[in-house]
Structure formats: structure tokens, C-alpha cells
Amino acid sequence: MGQTKSKIKSKYASYLSFIKILLKRGGVKVSTKNLIKLFQIIEQFCPWFPEQGTSDLKDWKRIGKELKQAGRKGNIIPLTVWNDWAIIKAALEPFQTEEDSISVSDAPGSCLIDCNENTRKKSQKETESLHCEYVAEPVMAQSTQNVDYNQLQEVIYPETLKLEGKGPELMGPSESKPRGTSPLPAGQVLVRLQPQKQVKENKTQPQVAYQYWPLAELQYRPPPESQYGYPGMPPAPQGRAPYHQPPTRRLNPMAPPSRQGSELHEIIDKSRKEGDTEAWQFPVTLEPMPPGEGAQEGEPPTVEARYKSFSIKMLKDMKEGVKQYGPNSPYMRTLLDSIAYGHRLIPYDWEILAKSSLSPSQFLQFKTWWIDGVQEQVRRNRAANPPVNIDADQLLGIGQNWSTISQQALMQNEAIEQVRAICLRAWEKIQDPGSTCPSFNTVRQGSKEPYPDFVARLQDVAQKSIADEKAGKVIVELMAYENANPECQSAIKPLKGKVPAGSDVISEYVKACDGIGGAMHKAMLMAQAITGVVLGGQVRTFGGKCYNCGQIGHLKKNCPVLNKQNITIQATTTGREPPDLCPRCKKGKHWASQCRSKFDKNGQPLSGNEQRGQPQAPQQTGAFPIQPFVPQGFQGQQPPLSQVFQGISQLPQYNNCPSPQAAVQQ
């Protein structure tokens, strides 16, 4: 039957406990063995069923339909499964709103047919499956008759029953009568519970009495905080703010339905069905109070501040995000901004949010930067004209006047905004463990790094190292050009100091560097290097210095100064035109001193036109005399070796050198 009993019990442990307590308080006892059997069948035929369970009646009706389809296909469904399914579905009916209730049962009409008549008409094989399909319906009817709906409603809606006895303004005239259970007719099945039927028939009862109330009332409520901070003392009077506040209203479950905010109610109802209604609770909400006696026209309305703590799910998401991505990752910054601007957070909320999400060292950094930001903000408040009456105790949530939650809930909107800005900036300065904040001077763009990535790194370092926002912006604009690579600098240089007023300098720089490093940009650079023409509004020239004049932009062979001098010298030295043919190469009209040919007109090599040096005499380095090789037949024609040496010794330039004979004798 799918998974074993132990796996089913561990998988749906919390949901099984909830179902058992719900049925027990409603007057129905179901054994754990039968519930495990039910969830084994659900696990087999309904794989979409969530592990955390569901309290939506539509899901349980869908389970019934799929189990009936499985029975029609020949699968055996035990009777206890049908019985437990019907009891749980009936117990979950009070959780549904009137819009979710259904007046007609989704059970097929053939449920009223006697099972014995079907077994006579069908074969033995079909009887077994039909028995599982239809016999459960009378059992469901018998099981639902013993449910004490008044007791079950008392558990689920405790505050609703209290409100019913307070006054006639919250209930209809027919609600004062006790609600009793009428016995079900024999042989018929009624899927909906009797209290839901009475609510629908009674038109005088408010339709939203059961909307958005159960989960809010089932939450744990701490004891009221006394004026002196000790539990058990008389509660302090509810604080009221005499100043004007925005028309923020608390979601009142007993308020009459209205068209305004219908989309918000739909979102809350959807999240409630998904099991995440706590995420829509605001820590501090302001509810306008009705005008009292003697109130004058035009007087700002008095509002009542109410506080609700963060949900466990929200704190868990923050903790997992910080642990997995880091406190200053883009995901965490977006999540923190949505919480900060979507809620009215007081200093106590920021402290709880930081303590539950950050490590001890990170929380110490956050607290340090928080205090530093408060001191700076207090100096600005005092220097303002007129001065702002917001002190450091209010921004930190300390002192005799701002230490309790009820006192912080009455903070002005301006103080709430200042606390939000200070805490967000303190959060941005938190460093990860083991990492150090580099200086903005060391942040340089790589040769292949995109320019937007370089600017993002530069802005991040500037935010963490520079406290003043204006100074940080100036530093970023300066370093965005100075620390960029040469290609981006050449693209930004025409825009430097020429960005029109009102435009973002960094945005213009990013636009100018768009496409640098790509294939198109590389092709443009190659074309500019080859042709030297203007492409894309830029001129690429030689960046080295000329060895002749020392200027940048050309080589020595292309130096205009040298070319001009050569032309002048040639014009002054020649003075007359060259002959028809060169006397050296015989193939050009130029002077022999200017001839650079290596071959003459017949293709014979020509000697160089440079002056030759004097030839050097041979030197004997060995101990044996040199015997020149003389072929046979020519021995008599060659002079003796002594005469050769004697002639060489008579050369004037070698008079100081020893003779070869002396060298041989030595």
C-alpha cells in the first residue's frame, strides 16, 4: 500500500495530531491505526497531497472523488477509510467561508440505491468494487450524527461565541437561539454540517463573521504588559496618538464586507488556504477610532496603535537567507527592503530581526553602526530649521519614554522613517566573517571584465567605506574613469565633464562602454589600426614616441621634421638634374651617390657603395710552420716562402709586428 506505517506516521505526524485533537474535541474518536490506513490510501491514489496537510474542504472533496474513481477501476478501498474520510471532511466544514460552502453534495445519486439490489444485478467481480464504493455512504451518515457541532465550534471559534453574547449589533436576532443538531434521515447523505446550513439560511447574520478569524485567534497571546513592566499588574491604558496619521486600517474580521480592499482580501484568503496567513500580519497597525463626545469638525481623527509580532516563517526565511547568501547579497537586500517598506517597524522589531537573523559578530556590527547613525541623525535634527524633536532614545528604543513596545508603537511617522533609513544603512555595512572591506583605490577593472560589473564593485566598496552619500557619489564618478581599463577610458574620455545637468554620470558611462570587449569592438580596433581612419567617432593612433622629434603619434620614418630636412638637403646639394642613366647600375635616372641598386641592368651583383677598411694580416697561432699547398707542376713558378714573408714585413703598417720567421723559430 505504498509506504510503510512508520514512514506515514513520521511524515504526517503534526497533521495527524491536529486531526485527532480536532475530532476528539468534536466528540468523535478515531484510532491512530485507522488514520494511518487512510493516509496510506491517500498516499497511493493522491500523490499531490501535501506533506504538511491541508484544511481546505475542496482538497478533501477531491480526495473522495479520486478514491471513488479508484474503486470503479477495481481497487479495494476499506470501509474504515470511507468512514474516516467522511468524518474529517465534515469536521473541516466550519473552517470554510460561506463562499467556499456548497449547497449540493458531490456524492453521486446512486448512493441511495440499496447495496443488496446492486449485488443481485451485477456479477461477483463487480460486486466487490461496488460494495467498497457505495456501502460507505450510510456509514458516513451514521458517523456524522454523533458529532457535537456546538462543542466543535466552541473550540475553533472561541471569540466568535463570546461576541455573540455581547450585543445585538454583531449578530442577528435568530443567533441567540441555541444551535442543535437535527438527526439525518435514514438512507440519505448530507455532506455539509448543520451549522453551515443554518448560517446560509439565516440572512440577518453577518456574512463575514467566520472570515479570517480562526487562525488569528488560535495564536499565542502574551499576557498584557503592565505600566511598570511586571506581569500580573493591571494593564496600562491603550495608547492613542493625538497627531495625524495616514489612513492605515487594521484588518478587522468582524467588519462588514466592502468593495474597497477586495483584492487584498482575496490575497489573504489565498495565503490562508496555503497555510501562510501569518506573513500578512503587520507588526504595528493604526486603526482610526470613532470621534468622541465634543469632537469638533476638521479635527484630525484619533488612531489606535496595535502591535503584532513577526511570524516564525518570516524570521526563518531571513535566517536561511543570511546563512546561505550572506547579509548583503542581492536576495537579502531585496527581502529586507520589502519587509522594511511594507511594515511599520519600530526599534524593537529591528532588534528582533537582527538578533534572529545575524550571527553574534554580525549583530555587534549592526548595533555599532546603528548607534553611529543615530548620533549623526540627532545632529541633523538639531541643526534643522525648525529643529526636529526626535532624540537618540527614540531612535534606539531606550530610555524611560521609549523602552516598551506600547510606547514605541506611538512613534511618529517621521521617527519611523528615520529608524528605517538608519537601520538599512547599518545593515549594508555588515561584513561577512573572514572578509575585509577593500579600499576603493584598489578596485580596478580587469582587461576582460565588463564595465557594469566593475562599477557595481566600486559602488559596493564606496557604500561600506564612505559614510557621506554625496562624497561617495563623487568618489565613484571619479574612480569609474581613473580605475577603468584603457579601452573604457578612451570611450569615457569624450564624456568626462560634459554630462548634461540632471543626467546620471554613471549611467552615461555605462552606455558609452556598452559593447566594449565584444567581437564588433575588436573588429573596429583592427580596422582602425590598419587604416587609421575614423571609425565610430574615435581615432586610433600610434601611442609611442618618435625617436627623431620626441612627439607622440608617429614613427621616426614618418616624422614630418625628418622628411622636410631630407627634401631641403637634397635640393641644396644636387643643384642640377641627374643624367639620363646612373653610371653605376645603368638603369635609372639618378646620381651614383644616390644609387641603392644591388644588381645592374644585366643582373650582375654590384658592390656596396660604402668605404672599405684596410685588410688585416693573417696571424699564426700554432707552433708548426705554415706550409702552403702547391700543386704539382707549379712548384718552380712559386716564389720561396722566405721571399713572401720578406715582402709582407716591408708593409708600413706591420713594421712593429714580428716577422713570421721569428714567430716560427720561437
UniProtKB/Swiss-Prot annotation:
Predominant location category: membrane
Keyword match Lyase: no
Disulphides: none
Lipidation (N-myristoyl glycine): G2
Region (Disordered): 164-183, 598-642
Record key words, sorted: Cell membrane, ERV, Lipoprotein, Membrane, Metal-binding, Myristate, Repeat, Transposable element, Zinc, Zinc-finger
GO biological process assignments: viral translational frameshifting
Localization of this protein: Cell membrane
Zinc finger (CCHC-type): 544-561, 580-597
SMART domains xref list: ZnF_C2HC (SM00343)
UniProt GO molecular function: nucleic acid binding; structural molecule activity; zinc ion binding
Record protein name field: Endogenous retrovirus group K member 10 Gag polyprotein
Membrane topology: Lipid-anchor
Further information: This Gag protein is encoded by a human specific provirus.
Keyword Cell cycle: no
Feature: compositional bias, Low complexity: 624-640
Pfam families hit by this protein: Gag_p10, Gag_p24, Gag_p24_C, zf-CCHC, zf-CCHC_5
Record PTM text: Myristoylation is essential for retroviral assembly. Alteration of the glycine residue leads to a block in the budding of particles and an accumulation of Gag inside the cell. Specific enzymatic cleavages may yield mature proteins.
GO CC entries: plasma membrane
Family, per entry: Belongs to the beta type-B retroviral Gag protein family. HERV class-II K(HML-2) gag subfamily.
Biological role stated in the UniProt entry: The products of the Gag polyproteins of infectious retroviruses perform highly complex orchestrated tasks during the assembly, budding, maturation, and infection stages of the viral replication cycle. During viral assembly, the proteins form membrane associations and self-associations that ultimately result in budding of an immature virion from the infected cell. Gag precursors also function during viral assembly to selectively bind and package two plus strands of genomic RNA. Endogenous Gag proteins may have kept, lost or modified their original function during evolution.
